[in-house]
Amino acid sequence: IGAGMCLMVVIWYALATVLSGMLYQVLHTTNLPNWAVYVASDTPLYLVAMPLAVLIMGKSSVIETRKFDMKPGQFFKLLVMCFPLMYVGSLIGNMLASLLSGGKASNSVSDLAMQFDVWNVVFLVILGPLFEEWIFRKELISRTRKYGEKTAIVFSALFFALVHMNLFQFFY
């Protein structure tokens, strides 16, 4: 499982580096437009690195997700409970990033998300969450569930945070 996930990151970075270099050459620019940045970064991840990671992890036994009934009121109650946790997590991430950078860190993901661009919607709102939920929740948790439900969730969350390499989002 770990080898598959590590290989995913290595393949992703290698292919993204090659593809972005090619796009710089083809577009004759030193500053890639948003669509080109997304194509260079996300295409190798979604179409090559993630599927290869799943193939490598394929030998590990999969334990399917159990289904639980939840009434709308219970869902709403849990949702409301999550907001303060997210806020506190955001504060911790901001304080840690500020502390470690001497106050010079900036939240590039937040800055990028604030720009309205159709490519942001496609890659940050639609494709990103779909592929990330698939790999980190479905594939990773179902393969680590044999170590316990909580362990699987924590492992998935930690790997999600490490792959994003963003202290601002680390505690979400």
What do these predicted ranges mean?
Residues 120-172:
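Transmembrane helix-loop-helix hairpins at the membrane interface
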Residues 30-36, 63-134, 142:
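Juxtamembrane helix-loop-helix connectors linking adjacent transmembrane helices
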Residues 1-84:
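N-terminal, membrane-interfacial amphipathic/helix-forming hydrophobic leader that caps
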Residues 10-18, 87, 157-165:
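Aromatic-anchored segments of alpha-helical transmembrane domains
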Residues 16, 20, 49-54, 58, ...:
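Alpha-helical transmembrane segments of polytopic integral membrane proteins
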Residues 38-43, 49-53, 59, 105-108, ...:
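Aromatic-residue detector
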